[in-house]
Amino acid sequence: MRICLVGVGQSVPGFEDIWFGIIEKGYKKVLRPDTEVVQRGLKVGLGNPLDYTNNYYTHLNLGSIVEAFIEAEKEGFDAAVVGCFDDWGIKEASAVVDIPLIGPGLSSVLFACQLGRKFAVIVANMPGIVPHIEEQIRA
């Protein structure tokens, strides 16, 4: 099985290697021997975390994530994952690709619902993030 892990920021030399390295340590522990994960940054989009609050950059970012999912399907990946709890692009890309798309936010919320009636989500202290996550959970 081949899975494409799509980062949520523009490819930045140095930072991307560090971020993907941290993520890789987590999934390598549970990855099946016959499964390959290919990590991808975006060609256009968020250049740094502060751009998160800029509507223009988030718009570019969303389009780039959807394009990355489309490319993953064309390249024969069996599934794709977005590398952010916000599940950027999952809903939009699901309308145009047939491969499974996985977002850690929805996956985590659904798992938490199996464990109990109440749960909490800890998020970054960034403008606009709390309403976004609340909307994501209600959906």
Give the role of each language-model region.
Residues V38-R40, V81-V82, L101-P104:
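General beta-strand structural signal in soluble alpha/beta enzymes
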Residues M1-H59, N125-A139:
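N-terminal glycine-rich anion-binding loop in soluble enzyme alpha/beta folds
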Residues V6, K74-C84:
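Periplasmic-binding protein-like
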Residues S94-L115:
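Short, acidic/small-residue loops that bind anionic groups at enzyme active sites
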